[in-house]
Structure formats: C-alpha cells, structure tokens
Amino acid sequence: IFLLTFIFISSLPVFSDNSAKSELFEYLIQNNTSSFLVSEKGEILLEEEFEVQKKLKPQSLMFFNLLRHGFIENRSQEDVASIQKSFVSILIGIAQQKGLLDINKSVTSYIGKWTLLTQEKENLITIRNLLTMTSGLDADFKYDAQPGSKWLYNSRVYSQLIYVLEKTSGLQINELSSQWLFNELEMKETFWKERKKGFGGFPKDS
C-alpha cells in the first residue's frame, strides 16, 4: 500500500498510449497511491494525484487520517511522516554552518530543562545524540541508557530538535524552513502544520 508521495527517477519515455496510462492509473488507485511522478533530468514527464480510499488493512487505518489532509489547488496535501526528520537534520546542519549551534553541545544549553533526568545527566545529551537516536532516553523522556551507548528510534525525543532550531534562530519552524530550505528548493507547497495530540511523537507535521 502506498500512502506517501513517491518520486520516480526514470529514463522511460512519456506515456503516449492513453490505454496504458489508464491501466497504470487504475493500478495505482487500487493500491492507494496518492501521488505519482516520473522525472528525468529534472523534467517532469508525468504527474498525477489520486484520492486515497479507506480500503486499507486495519494496521494502516491510523495512517489514513494522519496522511490525508484534503487537496490544495487539486494537489493532495499530506503529512510526510518521518521524512520530516530528514528536513530537520538538514536544517540543523544549516544552523551549525551559520554558527548558531554546535551539535556536540548539550541540548539543554539551547532549550533549557527538557527531560525527567537530573540536570547532571541531562547535560550529557547532545544535539548529535538526538540526530543519531542515541539520547539514552525512552519515549517518556526517562533514563534508559548512557547517551551515545544505545540506539533507539525515538520520535518524541528527536522532535526536540525543532525547538532547538526555533530557539537558536529566533524564527518559527515554518519561516525558518522556508528561508533556509524550501524556497531554495522551490518547494512552494511544503509547510509545517500542528498535529492532533502530537501524533507519532512529532508535535508538527510537514
């Protein structure tokens, strides 16, 4: 089942056979593909948006409400889920390049107290630890291991990087992302939006 937007880089020629194109689109719709794009050397050869139907497996139903946010100018609006972590890590890299932060310094030095640990233990957790999922914290921000000693996929802890970015830049995440990244990449329809109850551990989606 495809729920996210997939971009295919291909050397295939433009689909000139309408029957073949219709057959392809029907297959994509049946498999709950929301967006399909074929690109070659930076040129978009074929692009189409589809409405995802609720014919999903039980374990996928939760993602329907997470990923479907309707349409904007006939284009599907979706939460890109954990792809946003790639955006955040790039923005952290840009912030360091600008001299606004150092990934080897503690998270606390930028956003203040943020865990349930003692101040001494919390000070050991660096931005690098958050980037590499080695904070040593569990999903409730409690101690689980020494920072850097154990890998644990933890979206709630990783999301603190958004606050680090906002604190160090003096900008809200949408403004910051647009200025530093989205505008440069001509991603004119990409933005951050509040999630309901911090779904998936991130307070916002992209």
Model-predicted regions and their roles:
Residues H69, D79-S82, Q97-L137, T168-S206:
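Active-site helix/loop module of the DD-peptidase/beta-lactamase fold
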Residues N18-E26:
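Short, basic/aromatic recognition patches
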Residues I9-S11:
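N-terminal signal peptide c-region/cleavage motif recognized by signal peptidases
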